[in-house]
Amino acid sequence: IVGGVEAVPNSWPHQAALFIDDMYFCGGSLISPEWILTAAHCMDGAGFVDVVLGAHNIREDEATQVTIQSTDFTVHENYNSFVISNDIAVIRLPVPVTLTAAIATVGLPSTDVGVGTVVTPTGWGLPSDSALGISDVLRQVDVPIMSNADCDAVYGIVTDGNICIDSTGGKGTCNGDSGGPLNYNGLTYGITSFGAAAGCEAGYPDAFTRVTYFLDWIQTQTGITP
């Protein structure tokens, strides 16, 4: 997250940290005690994932943290890495996690938020373009929803399955935030998907997978509904 602030510890208790094949880092959202929602580009081709829940400082072994390894995940069957479409995946935990003050599920929205609504992506991704690694602590930033038309004018690959934010002023998501939630009013409206190659602080829009567009897919895979 660039241009943001450190989150209050455990204030986003659905936020998951994903260590994929001991090589890649992503975020995710706990949508039930046994299911994590994340991005396809995080899980495509993966062998296993260590899911960390209840974390704030990801580089410390906090008492609130629970780590569960999973090899059971489903990437959307029509995920296309070239145009970054259908960028959604779910991970099934082998044992349902015990919910605590620091570990909770997040709801899915049944309707969308309008353009201009201020929403909050969260994650441990790079805190600046010059950062050498992911953030130690969970970070957040408040940003407005922008229209898909304006977003597509920049990228040319934005579809109804996306929702975008205006990152003017260098506020938005960055490498390592992928798969994490776009939070608003206690629900997650998006899955962090892609941004501009020019850099996270360059002010170009950030694109997310639009959760409402994939509600049927999520229900088919997990049985979970809004």
From Swiss-Prot:
Under CDD domains, the record lists: Tryp_SPc
Q: Does the keyword Repeat apply?
A: no
Enzyme class, top EC level, equals hydrolase
- Provide the alphabetized UniProt keywords: Collagen degradation, Disulfide bond, Hydrolase, Protease, Serine protease
- According to the UniProt record, which cysteines are disulfide-bonded? C26-C42, C151-C164, C174-C200
PANTHER family with a match to the protein in the record: AT26814P-RELATED, POLYSERASE-RELATED
Family indicated by similarity = Belongs to the peptidase S1 family.
Put simply, this protein is called Brachyurin
